[in-house]
């Protein structure tokens, strides 16, 4: 019973690593999308956000299942840890790999957040510039329409 439970815990950790690697791939894809503010594909960006959301949901499910099973196995394992030393060592190695991936993902997320903030800031500036240009053109149009019936003010009168 304990051995099969430890196998399931190990399998859960392996799946978690696979999901985390997929998140890293999505982060790289997101970085490429956001790299050049003028050529951002909004649809592709949204797709990466959705994909990462699904992957994070998978991670949460794996974590919940792992924790529930771990709590049961922990009690049963008790003093028999030496009997399962190899399995425990493999799981510790997997947990170290997960910790490294987690740190890498966090760093990539911070980088992508800065890129996204830059993109949104540039987009806001473009919108403000367009709004200002449009307002200036409208004001010019209104002003010119108001002055169309006024005769010239400066006439050269020579006697």
Question: Residue spans of the language-model regions?
Answer:
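Long, hydrophobic N-terminal alpha-helical segment
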Residues: 1-61
């Amino acid at each position: 019973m304990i051995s099969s439970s430890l196998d399931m815990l190990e399998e859960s950790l392996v799946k978690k690593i696979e999901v985390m690697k997929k998140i890293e791939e999505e982060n790289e894809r997101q970085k490429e999308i956001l790299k050049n503010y003028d050529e951002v594909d909004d649809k592709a960006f949204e797709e990466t956000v959705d994909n990462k959301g699904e992957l994070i949901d998978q991670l949460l499910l794996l974590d919940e299942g792992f924790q529930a099973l771990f709590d049961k196995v922990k009690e049963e394992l008790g003093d028999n840890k030496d009997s399962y030393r190899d399995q425990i060592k493999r799981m510790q190695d997997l947990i170290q790999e997960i910790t490294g991936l987690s740190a890498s993902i966090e760093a990539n997320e911070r980088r992508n957040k800065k890129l996204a903030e830059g993109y949104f800031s540039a987009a806001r500036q473009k919108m403000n510039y367009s709004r200002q240009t449009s307002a200036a053109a409208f004001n010019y149009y209104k002003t010119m329409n108001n002055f169309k019936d006024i005769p010239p003010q400066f006439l050269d009168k020579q006697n």
